[in-house]
């Protein structure tokens, strides 16, 4: 079993699977420098060369090989996400420690200390954060993200929606969120109460629905979930044409067509948040195969 599972995972076409998340190489570089900074990476590169030539310090080569391999693996499959940058942290830490260990000039130590101070202070300066990776405009000399949490003006509305869903959806039933933007998605609803220190009144019942065409080929959850929370206009976060499954499913529910005919709206749950109309639908029967075929024909035309 393990061998078959391993072969299946290793032979998978990840480039096609995550094609919806693949942008330009420039986007990768802008994200990487946003969190690490050009100066920091450049200083480590120069110090590695100097240590290799003058100190015969070759351990840094292993760290650079590890980071370069990770970089090219991602460039060949998809654009980096913030979480993927953690792959580079161990090597960057070791490069920094080795570089500091070989510092013999006082001015170099002062310079490294000043750079560390600038990095530490700069990430706590309040600034407007991009809503997604494609909004990062340029490469950064020093890290220019903000450690301060993003404040939302619609927090009360999100909490009210979550509480309404908790009291409306029957115990044991599942809820799917047909929205995938940074304004509304399943993770926002799941984490709304914990992130604000509000005690949840029930266990999580939210399940993932298909969101990305190239990645989510199994549409079964969309046909079997007990409740669907639908946001209109369709909430997506990738380039046009990458999330047709979300857009077409929203069209079905808004027009009460094909797969949506298996559901009934729960009108008391309708609300508007930040210009987005949100409706809850309850499945009252199994999906008909004819409706599924009609819906999927729009996806794979």
Label the model's feature ranges:
Residues 50-59, 96-114:
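Membrane-interface junctions at the ends of membrane-embedded or membrane-associated helices
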Residues 46-49, 160-163, 187-194, 248-253:
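Short, well-ordered amphipathic alpha-helices
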Residues 38-43, 61-63, 71, 78-105:
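Hydrophobic/aromatic-rich transmembrane helices and adjacent perimembrane loops
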Residues 1-59, 68-78, 122:
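Transmembrane-lumen/periplasm boundary regions of multi-pass, lipid-linked membrane glycan transferases
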Residues 116-182:
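Membrane-embedded, lumen/periplasm-facing catalytic core of multi-pass transferases
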Residues 171-172, 176-224, 234-248:
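Extracytoplasmic
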Residues 223-301:
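Aromatic/acidic, Gly/Pro-rich catalytic loop(s) in extracytoplasmic/lumenal soluble domains
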Residues 59-61, 163, 213-217:
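A generic local structural motif
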